[in-house]
Amino acid sequence: MSVLFPINLEGALEALLFVSPEPLSLKKIAQTLELSVEEAKEIVLRLQEKLEQDQRGIMLHFSGEEVWLTTRPDFSVYIERLFKPPAQHLTQATLETLAIIAYKQPVTKTEIELIRGVKADSSIATLLEKGLIEEAGRKDAPGRPIIYRTTAKFLEFFGLKSLDELPPLNLENEAVNDGNNNFEE
């Protein structure tokens, strides 16, 4: 064993496996740690046993001539939490805008603003960014305004198979049209 300086070989192997984007061959491990292939295999087996005994968060896999690390399945719930995308919270204004688009599509920004009575730029930008709506072309009207429609992601987000599954609007109980395209409680 011709090591450059005294070192914890299991620790060195663990570091190599941690930074390697792919499995390492025994030969590559031996070359890197300046060991024989047989010595490298001993270090691999010792580290594998040590990780198993200590119930660490990682496991060493040794198959044929390749060695790699994975996370221990027992801890998968924590890993999923770490990488789970944050919940997509939509403001009341954004939900109102989305409802208008869902029920009136295809619809322009101006039409949305006439119904809501306020600007819809921010809500539309949020819905586009989250992929819940998309541009559906341009309306054949002066200025050729962009028209919007919902996406497949919208259906998935709300657990719908099609727009036909949208609940019917009950304008008598929830909102009434005051004749000016403004809805009031």
UniProtKB/Swiss-Prot annotation:
Keyword terms: Cell cycle, Cell division, Chromosome partition, Cytoplasm
GO biological process, one term: chromosome separation
InterPro entries noted in UniProt: ScpB_csome_segregation, WH-like_DNA-bd_sf, WH_DNA-bd_sf
Alphabetized Gene3D superfamilies for the sequence: Winged helix-like DNA-binding domain superfamily/Winged helix DNA-binding domain
Keyword Cell inner membrane: no
Keyword Cell division: yes
Predominant location category: cytoplasm
Localisation: Cytoplasm
GO-annotated cellular components: cytoplasm
Physiological role: Participates in chromosomal partition during cell division. May act via the formation of a condensin-like complex containing Smc and ScpA that pull DNA away from mid-cell into both cell halves.
Record note on quaternary structure: Homodimer. Homodimerization may be required to stabilize the binding of ScpA to the Smc head domains. Component of a cohesin-like complex composed of ScpA, ScpB and the Smc homodimer, in which ScpA and ScpB bind to the head domain of Smc. The presence of the three proteins is required for the association of the complex with DNA.
NCBIfam families attached to this UniProt entry: SMC-Scp complex subunit ScpB
Family according to the record: Belongs to the ScpB family.
Protein name in the entry: Segregation and condensation protein B
Organism: Carboxydothermus hydrogenoformans (strain ATCC BAA-161 / DSM 6008 / Z-2901)
